[in-house]
Amino acid sequence: MTLAEEFRSRNFSIYGQWTGVLCIILCIALGIANIFSFAVLRIIFSVLCLISGLILIFIEVPFLLRICPTSSKFDAFIRRFTTNWMRAAMYGVMSVVQWLSLLPGSGASSLIVAAVFLLIASIFYALAGLKSQEFVGSKTLGGQGLVQMIV
């Protein structure tokens, strides 16, 4: 299945996964950009954003669990997020954490962009769950086709 065919499938988990890839890029970039601040709360939220981005890499690009040396506890933690509902909940929690970066001690920052895109990914996964669509991983990002080629 090509990338265009994946998007035409109208499976919201595909949309959620590709929005998740965008969230990875945004969380890492904005986490690094906002860490150079004098506001202690903003530094804390930027570190949390950076950690979120690093966790999302392993959740959204599954073949990385096979090629990167990780502990069995970390692998078990990542494998919890295989359903649409669990991913929607995870993205929702990460979004709420970034929305909390608007607290008065931190002030408004570009971390809001990460919060918005994390919320969009959460909505896509929740819609997939509501429509009872099975989670389908993109083959481009390491779905079944790529994983079988590596093994």
Swiss-Prot record:
Alphabetized, the UniProt keywords read: Glycoprotein, Golgi apparatus, Membrane, Transmembrane, Transmembrane helix
Q: Which GO terms describe its cellular component?
A: Golgi membrane
**Gene Ontology biological process terms, A to Z:** vesicle-mediated transport
Q: Name one Pfam family in it.
A: Cg6151-P
- Location (main, coarse): Golgi
What is the top-level taxon of the source organism? Eukaryota
Q: Does the keyword Glycoprotein apply?
A: yes
Q: Which residues are glycosylated?
A: 11
Q: Membrane topology for this entry?
A: Multi-pass membrane protein
What InterPro entries does the annotation carry? TVP18/Ca-channel_flower (IPR019365)
Q: Where are the transmembrane segments?
A: 21-41, 43-63, 88-108, 110-130
Give compartment(s). Answer: Golgi apparatus membrane
| Purpose of the protein | Golgi membrane protein involved in vesicular trafficking.
Describe the family membership recorded for this protein in Swiss-Prot or TrEMBL. Belongs to the TVP18 family.
- Listed name of the protein: Golgi apparatus membrane protein tvp18
Lineage per the UniProt record: Eukaryota, Fungi, Dikarya, Ascomycota, Pezizomycotina
